Structures are given as structure tokens and as C-alpha cells.
């Protein structure tokens, strides 16, 4: 059997290698227009940042090494330009000479992948404008940054690739601005409130992020000098285009293949509508494991799984690819984000009666030296308690939380299946009650009515407007809120009416839940706990008592302070010193400001 595979990165090389292991008699040929095969595409940003020192580390196998290990014939520098399915031939052009020839096949596998989308704007051909797809791209970017001592860069696209590139450019000492046309970062990957938290974190880390912004033109003569956007002109010496990807399927448009928006449609055995033609990887439309509906999920991990399944199918094994969950994880400066399954919005659109929770927890024993945090958002079906999705933020191993959810969703788990799961525990690794299980407990409490809460999304939308904020922290920390010492609550609380709407807020949510439990037993009927508490939400109380007069506001601003427009009486100031010293006049100004009520 002669099997021709077009494309030699993840899905292509996986399919070919598995084919030869399953059937040594098969004649397997891989054709690719690139000079490299089987390279670590997901590792390219880390080469740019210098975390990976040598380009060769990105090459899993050279063509010669791969051929020797697997018995697969590899032809590089060969670009497929047409498919003649009726003749069982692919027309291939030599990249260097332009010569064309026909390759016959018994079975054809299309693993042509995807490339960064090219923006329909002026200036994409300027020096200093790059995309990120191959090791050559990464090498060119790194060399350009170092040779030109780049100070400012703009990244177009706030998906996984764009954010990874931004982090690694920052590691090279470059000031980075990320822009995206969508209203949030990581669109269709995480829900809005999770994206808001991550965006704020990036800003704190020194990466500027502008969402809801379109690139209109790339400025410059010979080399890029800036990007004209709907938000204004952004000066830069380097521009990375990472605004999504599109399948490399243009040459297949007149082949008779059934396609949708450039993706190849396949069944569960990875077969196309054409006889003896199969496809896998970033160029195919598969299905979502939860909804069963079509989903394009271009990930290296999925491409490998699809390639393995396809190889088994081609060698006679009765096997089907179950689809994707869109599982992914991304590393930002001092923050990791992981996700799998459906977002809240996607679950609602799929017809589920959705219930969610946002739960901050420790990621290991709080007293252990490198203890960090998880913020876990669980998405489930209210009636069946079926787990539908998870999103996790944290400064540690968020992938372990995501992987638990992946296995649960794969097995059709309901929340109760996790209650007594015997997860590994030791202080250096986890908490006595696993963080994932803690989040499940909280969501179950919410479903059965033991916890009445307000989600961060609801809080951000203004649902707390008519609520009195009650600070339940260890010490008072919310300006303008009513402070309640939890340890002293043994009955009714003076100043809090039992019919009053009370929003209970603490550091992470536990103390708020404890107070709600007590207050409900004392007859308080309208208490609500803010999910995520102060750890996740920016909690502010509108002060209606200490309104600053216009005259006083003018006086304070004259001292060099800026008014915080989100409050009625708060001003912000900054002291810039020279070698750590301030003048006598500056000292008097600071002292006067400190005395302000």
C-alpha cells in the first residue's frame, strides 16, 4: 500500500511513524515545502525569548534522522499545488527549481496545517514585520531584535501565540504592546471575567494590552516604525502578526473536497468525502466531545492524537477519533492560564442550564515556602451536575487542575464523582483537600442552596448596586464597607437589618461563606457572598457621605494629585525623587497631603 502524506509537522509525522510501526510493508512518503520536519512549533516563542538557546533544540528530528528511525521517505522543499482525486495524484512543485511532477497514491493523507492569518493592510512587507510559524521565523525574529536593539514592539493578536510572544519579547527587554480586535484577550478561550483578571495582570507586569482595537495600517518606509490603529498610532520597531491562523488549504479549493471556511471536513475516522483521502491536524474540522457539534481546534496535542488515530484506521483497526475539548494552557509573566471544555457562554449557547463558580484556593499547603494560588472557574449543568468546563488561573501548575477536568469530562463525570476522589497529597504538592475538590464543594453548596453567591461577572455588571458591602476579612480592608469580625458574631449584628441586602466580602470567600451560614441562622434573609472575593474582584464601595466639594477637589489636584473617578473622595499621587532625596517644599506638600481627611 502506497500512502502519501502532505505536510510534515505534528499530524503528518505522527501519522507516518505510527503507520510504519503498524505495517512495515507500507510505502509511506511525507512531502513538505519546509526544510524542517517534526519541529516544536509550540516552542518557537521561547526560542525568541532566549529560554531555549539553540535552534537545533526545536527540531525533534531532522529529515534524515526521522527517515532512519521510522523507515518513512521524506521529501522536503516540495510544495503540493493541486489534488487530482480522480487520478489519485497530487501535483507537487519543487520550491527551488519550480519543476512540477505528479505523485501517485493508494491512500492520501492531508496534514497541511495552518499559517498565521495575513492582515489585509498596508505595510506587511516592511522590514521588522514578522509572523510566527517555523523555526526560521523564530530565528529571524530573535536575530532582528538583537541586531537592531529593538526597544518597542507591537503584537497583533491576544490569543495563545500572541501572548506567548509578548512574554518572551519582554524577557528580551522589549517594551511590548498587544492589541486585539476582540473585546477581551483570549477570545473564545476563556470567559470575560477571567480575561479581565489576566489583562490586569499583564498590565501590572509591564505588558500593555489594548482590546477592541483594529490595526488599520503598518507605518514605515523600508522598515516598520509604527502601527496605525483605531486607538491611535503605536510606535514600534518590531511587529508580530499573530491575529489567528488559517488552514493551508488554498490549493484544494477546486479538488472536490468538502470544506468549511478553509477547513477540511472529516468523519470520525478522519476520512474526507473523497475516496481514499484522509486529513488530520490543524487543517481539519473535527467535533466537540461535549456537544458533538463541529469545532476547529488547531492544537499540536490534538494533531498528534488525530494522526495516531488515523494511522490505526489506515492499517485496519476499527477506531474513531472522539473529538476535542479545546484543552489549552498558556504561560504569562508570573501567571499561567489553563482551560478545557465549554466556556460559560458556549455552554449556554449549547442549551445547557448553566451554573458556575469562581473559587480562589491555595495550590499547596499555605505554609510551604513556594505556595501559590489557583483561581478555578467551574462550569456545570445545573440539573444533571455534569461537568462542562473549567478555567484556571495561577502562578503554578494549573495544568494539573485542567487535566483532572479533562479526564472527568471524558468519562462523563458529574460533580459528585469528584467529592471523594483520592488525589495525591503532601505539603510540597497540594492541599489536604485537593484544590479541584474544594472548587467542586463550593459549586455543590451553591447548587443545593447552602451558599447564595454573586458571580464576578454579575458584580462587574452592577448587580451589587443595591447591596450594603460587609467586609469579613481578618482586618478591615474595604474602604467604606461595614466591617464585621467573624469571631465575634454570635447573634444579630447591630447596624445590619435582617431584610437588608448584604454583600459579604472577604479575602478569598471562605469567611464570607462562614458569616452567611451564621447570619442565615439568625434570621438574615438577603445575604450574598461575592465569589472570588477580593482576591479576584476589584471591590469598591461608593461613598455617599464623604463627598469632596469642587473647591476641595481643585485644591487637592493643585498639589499634583489625580482624582480616582471610581470614588467620590479618593485621590492618587506619585512622588518622584532624585537619588532618593526630596526638597523641603516637596516634603511640605507630601505632609500636607497626608493630613487630608
What are these regions (language model features)?
Residues 110-172, 208, 261, 266-268, ...:
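Glycine-rich dinucleotide-binding loop and its adjacent helix/turn
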Residues 1-75, 79, 160, 166-190, ...:
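Beta1-alpha1 glycine-rich phosphate/pyrophosphate-binding loop at the start
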Residues 125-149, 219-226, 233-309, 404, ...:
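FAD-site-proximal beta/loop scaffold in flavoenzymes
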Amino acid at each position: 500500500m502506497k500512502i502519501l502524506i502532505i505536510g510534515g509537522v505534528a499530524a503528518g509525522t505522527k501519522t507516518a511513524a505510527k503507520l510504519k510501526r503498524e505495517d512495515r510493508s507500507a510505502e509511506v512518503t511525507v512531502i513538505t515545502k519546509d526544510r524542517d520536519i517534526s519541529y516544536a512549533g509550540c516552542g518557537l516563542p521561547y526560542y525568541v525569548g532566549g529560554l531555549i538557546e539553540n535552534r537545533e533544540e526545536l527540531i525533534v528530528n531532522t529529515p534524515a534522522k526521522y527517515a532512519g528511525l521510522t523507515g518513512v521517505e521524506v521529501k522536503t522543499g516540495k510544495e503540493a499545488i493541486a489534488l487530482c482525486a480522480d487520478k489519485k495524484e497530487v501535483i507537487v512543485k519543487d520550491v527551488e527549481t519550480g519543476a512540477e511532477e505528479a505523485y501517485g497514491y493508494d491512500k492520501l493523507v492531508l496534514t497541511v496545517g495552518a499559517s498565521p492569518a495575513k492582515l489585509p493592510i498596508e505595510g506587511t512587507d516592511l522590514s521588522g514585520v514578522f509572523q510566527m510559524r517555523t523555526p526560521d521565523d523564530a530565528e529571524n525574529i530573535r536575530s532582528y531584535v538583537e541586531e537592531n536593539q529593538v526597544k518597542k514592539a507591537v503584537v497583533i493578536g491576544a490569543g495563545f501565540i500572541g501572548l506567548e510572544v509578548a512574554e518572551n519579547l519582554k524577557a528580551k527587554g522589549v517594551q511590548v504592546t498587544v492589541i486585539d480586535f476582540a473585546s477581551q484577550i483570549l477570545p473564545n478561550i476563556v470567559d470575560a471575567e477571567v480575561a479581565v483578571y489576566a489583562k490586569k495582570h499583564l498590565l501590572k507586569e509591564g505588558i500593555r494590552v489594548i482590546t477592541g482595537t483594529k490595526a488599520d495600517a503598518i507605518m514605515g518606509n523600508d522598515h516598520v516604525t509604527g502601527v496605525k490603529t483605531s486607538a491611535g498610532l503605536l510606535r514600534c520597531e518590531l511587529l508580530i502578526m499573530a491575529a489567528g491562523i488559517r488552514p493551508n488549504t488554498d490549493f484544494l479549493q477546486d479538488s472536490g473536497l468538502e470544506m468549511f471556511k478553509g477547513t477540511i471536513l472529516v468523519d470520525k475516522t478522519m476520512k474526507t468525502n473523497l475516496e481514499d483521502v484522509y486529513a488530520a491536524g490543524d487543517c481539519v474540522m473535527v467535533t466537540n466531545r461535549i456537544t458533538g457539534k463541529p469545532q476547529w481546534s488547531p492544537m499540536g496535542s490534538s494533531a498528534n492524537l488525530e494522526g495516531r488515530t488515523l494511522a490505526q484506521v489506515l492499517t485496519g483497526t476499527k477506531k474513531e477519533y472522539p473529538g476535542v475539548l479545546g484543552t489549552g494552557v498558556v504561560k504569562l509573566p508570573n501567571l499561567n492560564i489553563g482551560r478545557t471544555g465549554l466556556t460559560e457562554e458556549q455552554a449556554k449557547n449549547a442549551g445547557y442550564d448553566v451554573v458556575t463558580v469562581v473559587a480562589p484556593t491555595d495550590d499547596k499547603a499555605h505554609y510551604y515556602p513556594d505556595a501559590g494560588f489557583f483561581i478555578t472557574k467551574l462550569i456545570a449543568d445545573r440539573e444533571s451536575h455534569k461537568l462542562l468546563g473549567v478555567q484556571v488561573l495561577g502562578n503554578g501548575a494549573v495544568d494539573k487542575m485542567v487535566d483532572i477536568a479533562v479526564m472527568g469530562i471524558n468519562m462523563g463525570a458529574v460533580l459528585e464523582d469528584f467529592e471523594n476522589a483520592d488525589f495525591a497529597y503532601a505539603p510540597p504538592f497540594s492541599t489536604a483537600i485537593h484544590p479541584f475538590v474544594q472548587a467542586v464543594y463550593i459549586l455543590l453548596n451553591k447548587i443545593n442552596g447552602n451558599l447564595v453567591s454573586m458571580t464576578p461577572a454579575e458584580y462587574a455588571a452592577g448587580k451589587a448596586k443595591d447591596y450594603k458591602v460587609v467586609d469579613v476579612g481578618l482586618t478591615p480592608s474595604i474602604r467604606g464597607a461595614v466591617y464585621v469580625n467573624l469571631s465575634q458574631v454570635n447573634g444579630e449584628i447591630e447596624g445590619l437589618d435582617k431584610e437588608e441586602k448584604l454583600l459579604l466580602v472577604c479575602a478569598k470567600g471562605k469567611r464570607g461563606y462562614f458569616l452567611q451560614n451564621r447570619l442565615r441562622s439568625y434570621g438574615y434573609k438577603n445575604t450574598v457572598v461575592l465569589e472570588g472575593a477580593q482576591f479576584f474582584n476589584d471591590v469598591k464601595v461608593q461613598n455617599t457621605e464623604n463627598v469632596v466639594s469642587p473647591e476641595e477637589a481643585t485644591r487637592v489636584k493643585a498639589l499634583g494629585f489625580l482624582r480616582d473617578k471610581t470614588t467620590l473622595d479618593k485621590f492618587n499621587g506619585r512622588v518622584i525623587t532624585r537619588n532618593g532625596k526630596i526638597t523641603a517644599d516637596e516634603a511640605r506638600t507630601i505632609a500636607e497631603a497626608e493630613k487630608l481627611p
